[in-house]
From Swiss-Prot:
Its cofactor is Ca(2+). Pfam families: Sulfatase. It catalyses: an aryl sulfate + H2O = a phenol + sulfate + H(+). Hydrolyzes the bond between sulfate and the aromatic ring in a compound such as 4-nitrocatechol sulfate. The active site is at C51 (nucleophile), H115. This is Arylsulfatase. GO terms for cellular component: cytoplasm. It comes from Pseudomonas aeruginosa (strain ATCC 15692 / DSM 22644 / CIP 104116 / JCM 14847 / LMG 12228 / 1C / PRS 101 / PAO1). Optimum pH is 8.9. Optimum temperature is 57 degrees Celsius. Incubation that exceeds 20 minutes above 50 degrees Celsius leads to enzyme inactivation.
């Protein structure tokens, strides 16, 4: 029997479509670029529109409304509390990929962000990982710095503590010199070196970078000083040109216009421009440092002679983060005032441990172009993400695929490659959901042109924002005030930027998709009509 493959699944947090070099970016990502050149780049790979829903789909192969993250735990509203599929953690209706692989003899290792439950019975250790070092909440200071919290602390900061767990042990302190990406790289390397060499492994490396707060080692930030002084629109045009040059988008693609709540670059004061450019410099440094840590893991596997027997998948968990956190009352009524009192967000300090910044909608749309909008939206900018596969046994070297794929395909694909059958509807005496995704084995081996055909229907819903897609046709519903509160229709083959609404000219196609939407709601348990968290 041939040797079973290893698996290395790497997830970036809020990475934009064109951030890395292999996808048109200017940020130094030599290790990811090398993986891409030796593998397959996916230009139509889709996730959920935010972090934890995507992670639940990645590790189960089914929709997040089934897996327990119908909405993010941080966003549970009274109408959703207690509803099936809205538990706020990975529930018992699903079996997790590491549980199945461990049962089949794989060593299951994790270092990184979990975001699928905070309690002991919800941690990575409880869901199949033999060894794990993880950040449990959805974000945290990357250096572990936290000012004293009191009743005035905004909800967003209380909900993102530096809460780490190793295996079953919750950590009270973090080591001197801690930085999230380095710590995750260190731990995964430790687990790989300590593993049983006779068994294959599944290694999961979900970084918490480049999610806010934007923080990175100063020496890397300095490498980007001045790089973004021309502003986000200049970067957007630069990246669009590079995407076309690389063949990642069509040469005549029409990019969706920028939609932003902030002023134009030229209308900002000098200090505002300087601080905004510095935030982008720090963001770039976070991406570069993440890439460096990926390189350490890949180099180790290469030296061990394991790399070519390892299926490597890299992806972002959603589109770039364009939210203006201060604009959401749910995050705390005095967020900026609290940050002013407890952090130093002066120009020269931005990016250090005691700073706390994000980069806003214009930089995000420089990264998601030509797509519409960004994270949290069910438009393409929120759900179409960069992804690449390196596995010499199957993927074509240096190839680019424009075929539709979804994060729900990952679990079926890895199980197929491992020769492990999903248990179906029952596992260990309890009823479970079957995967909704499809294996890529036939696609990657060249037997088929794509994993999905034009009849595949895929749905999305989060925060009241909806989408349903079949083939190249996609219907989108964005509630007021963030959208028109009516269904819009797009032909993505001709209009990937979702600019030309065909709802009036193609009423039959829209009606057909709305019927698919109703079936999707029925199958997955979406609760319709709840107040959207982001606009309450």
């Amino acid at each position: 029997m041939s040797k079973r493959p290893n698996f290395l699944v790497i997830v970036a947090d809020d990475l934009g479509f064109s951030d890395i070099g292999a996808f048109g970016g200017e940020i130094a990502t030599p290790n990811l670029d090398a993986l891409a050149i030796a593998g397959l780049r996916l230009t139509d790979f889709h996730t959920a529109s935010t972090c934890s829903p995507t992670r639940s789909m990645l590790l189960t192969g089914t929709d997040h409304h089934i897996a327990g993250i119908g909405t993010m735990a941080e966003a549970l509203t009274p109408e959703l509390e207690g509803k099936p599929g809205y538990e706020g953690h990975l529930n018992e209706r699903v079996v997790a990929l590491p549980e199945l692989l461990r049962e089949a003899g794989y060593q299951t290792l994790m270092a990184g962000k979990w975001h699928l439950g905070l309690k002991p019975e919800q941690t990575p250790h409880a869901r199949g990982f033999e060894r794990s070092f993880s950040l449990l909440p959805g974000a945290a200071n990357h250096y572990g710095f936290e000012p004293p919290y009191d009743e005035s602390t905004p909800r967003i900061l209380k909900g993102t503590p530096a809460l780490y767990v190793e295996d079953e042990r919750y950590l009270d302190t973090l080591p001197e010199g801690f930085y999230s990406s380095d710590a995750f790289g260190d731990k995964l390397l430790q687990y790989l070196k300590e593993r049983d060499q006779s068994r294959p492994f599944f290694a999961y490396l979900p970084f918490s970078a480049p999610h806010w707060p934007l923080q990175a080692p100063r020496e890397i930030v300095e490498k980007y000083r001045g790089r973004y002084d021309a502003g986000p629109e200049a970067l957007r045009q630069e990246r669009l040109a590079r995407l076309k040059e690389l063949g990642l988008v069509e040469a005549d693609v029409e990019a969706h216009p920028v939609l932003a709540l902030t002023r134009e670059w030229e209308a900002l004061e000098d200090e505002e421009r300087a601080k905004s450019a510095r935030a982008m410099e720090v963001y770039a440094a976070m991406v570069e440092r993440m890439d460096w840590n990926i390189g350490r893991v890949v180099d180790y596997l290469r030296r061990q002679g394991e790399l070519d027997n390892t299926f490597v998948l890299f992806m972002s968990d959603n589109g770039a983060e364009g939210a203006l956190l201060e604009a959401f009352p749910k995050f705390g009524p005095d967020l900026l005032g609290f940050l002013d009192r407890h952090y130093d967000n002066s120009l020269e300090n931005i990016g250090r441990a005691n700073s706390y910044v994000w980069y806003g909608p214009r930089w995000a749309q420089a990264a998601t172009a030509p797509s519409r909008l960004y994270k949290a939206f069910t438009t393409q900018g929120g759900i179409r993400v960069p992804a690449l596969v390196r596995y010499p046994r199957l993927s074509r070297q240096g190839a680019i695929s424009h075929a539709f794929a979804t994060v729900m395909d990952v679990t079926p694909t890895l199980l197929d490659l491992a020769g492990v059958r999903h248990p179906g509807k029952r596992w260990r005496g309890r009823e479970i959901a079957e995967p909704r995704g499809r294996s890529w084995l036939g696609w990657l081996s060249g037997e088929t042109e794509a994993a999905h055909d034009e009849n595949t229907v895929t749905g999305w819903e989060l925060f009241g924002m909806r989408a349903i897609r079949q083939g190249d046709w996609k219907a989108v519903y964005l509630p007021a005030p963030v959208g028109p509160a009516t269904w819009q229709l797009y032909d993505l083959a001709r209009d990937p930027g979702e600019i030309h609404d065909l709802a009036d000219s193609q009423p039959g196609k829209l009606a057909e998709l709305i019927e698919h939407w109703k079936r999707y709601v029925s199958e997955t348990g979406v609760v319709e009509g709840a107040s959207p968290f982001l606009v309450r």
